[in-house]
From Swiss-Prot:
SMART domains: CheW. Transmembrane segments: none annotated. Necessary for proper aggregation of cells to form fruiting bodies. FRZ genes define a system of signal transduction analogous to the enterobacterial chemotaxis systems. The gene is frzB. The keyword Acetylation does not apply. It comes from Myxococcus xanthus. The keyword GTP-binding does not apply. Disulfide bonds: none annotated. The lineage of its organism: Bacteria, Pseudomonadati, Myxococcota, Myxococcia, Myxococcales. This is Frizzy aggregation protein FrzB. InterPro entries: CheW-like_dom_sf, CheW-lke_dom. GO terms for biological process: chemotaxis; signal transduction. Keywords: Chemotaxis, Transducer.
Length: 112
């Protein structure tokens, strides 16, 4: 699976690269989600499509797309009580990276 890795604040996240339309400059009104942490600078935005149109998630850095073997991915168990946007984790080298669904992230903010 192709994942896009990015930072919000000091935390590394990943998302399904097929959800991403492009990376752009961030605008003041772009989406931030306190639960993911607040960006230090937030100069970049991940642009993605929702049923209502394009949405933008403000991020600090984009690390690029990497193909990750399916056996390195884990779905978030329903009993974890995680937010709807937290779809799983990726076992990336020595750390675990939270994988988020961009459309669900926008819905959480009531933007789409």
């Amino acid at each position: 699976m192709d994942l896009l890795f990015f930072d919000i604040g000091a935390t590394l996240y990943g998302t399904d690269a097929s959800q991403v339309l492009r990376i752009d400059r961030a605008l003041p009104e772009d989406l931030t989600l306190a639960e993911l942490g607040l960006p230090h600078r937030g100069n970049r935005a991940i642009v993605f499509d929702t049923p209502e149109g394009e949405a933008h998630l403000k991020v600090d850095a984009v690390h690029g797309v990497r193909s990750i073997p399916v056996n390195s991915l884990r779905r978030m168990p329903p009993t974890a009580g995680a937010a709807a946007y937290a779809v799983g984790v990726c076992l990336e080298e020595a750390r675990t990276v939270l994988l988020i669904d961009l459309v669900e992230t926008a819905r959480t903010q009531g933007r789409h």
